[in-house]
Amino acid sequence: MDYVTLGRTGLRVSVAGLGCGGFSQLGLAQGKSEADAIAIIRQALGLGVNLFDTADAYGTEGVLGKAIKSVRREDVVICTKAPFSFSNPHSTSEGIVASLDKSLRQLDTDYIDVYQLHGVPPGAYDHALSDLAPVLLREKEKGKFCYLGITETAPHDREHQTLNRAAQDGVWDVVMVGFHMMHQNARDRVFPLTRANRVGTLLMFAVRNIFSQPERLRSTLRDLAAAGEVPQSFADPPDPLAFLIHDDGASTVPDAAYRFVRHEPGVDVVLFGTGDPAHLRTNIASILKPPLPEPDRAQLSALFGHLVGVGLDAPHLSRPRR
């Protein structure tokens, strides 16, 4: 495993982080048992993963808490998030402390490494900054968590308005950002600011459905070709990203997707989710591979660098927030 320093936190974290939500929720969303989910977490630990991202909304805090009992607490970096109910301009600051305490109980831990506000839309950012952050920072002083973070609502903030501000405000130590081969605008909107201000980054949406389901990729590119957003050659090819798969390049489209984001300047940790032991191994292996060949990266930028908001399907962010 490779490790990096997570922004100004000083935390040494694995470049591959296991996400405990998404469409899999450690396999629980596909009917797997709690024991199976615990086994996935412990397999990840065995492969060198030390950063785990969960949330109240995922229902996996308790599972993560049980799984990490097999290691020393200081050897694991726990990132979790407040309920979505606080990611609106009408939420109250009083309840956020109770939610933090609830996460501590469910994780069965004395402290959380990174506590994040979850999916904050641009219209709620001022409330998050002025009303919620000061309350949470007082709880930080009590030792309940170490660093404060914020995540964007990627499907409904395609221009990264929330993180563009958060990266400059000096309050948030860590941000979670959506970035992938067909949604690249964080390169200009977010990463220069996080790098300049030493804000740690957790990367989401590296693969999701668009790069793991061939028909989803084909249908998306057909629609984009019909709209004139990509060349007509993408209108109906059987394998539209075949140019990435070759002896010196990627082995699969998901492999290409992970390697594309992993080596983007400004990305600290690439989050991935799975409930399948084989997928866990292959995902980590892809994240640890070298960058894609420069001609392939250049072609991805030329073909898709102008696209915004493609492939940002998210189970917990299905409704717009203002």
Predicted region positions:
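Short amphipathic alpha-helices and their capping/turn segments at secondary-structure boundaries
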Residues: 1-11, 65-69, 96-107, 189-198
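Conserved, mostly hydrophobic/aromatic
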Residues: 6, 18, 37, 44, ...
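Short, well-ordered coil/turn segments that N-cap beta-strands
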Residues: 9-16, 47-51, 72-76, 109-113, ...
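A cross-family glycoside hydrolase active-site/sugar-binding cleft signature
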Residues: 16-19, 53-55, 79-81, 115-118, ...
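Glycine/proline-rich, positively charged
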Residues: 26, 42, 88-189, 199-202
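Structured C-terminal cap/extension of enzyme domains
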Residues: 45, 189-322
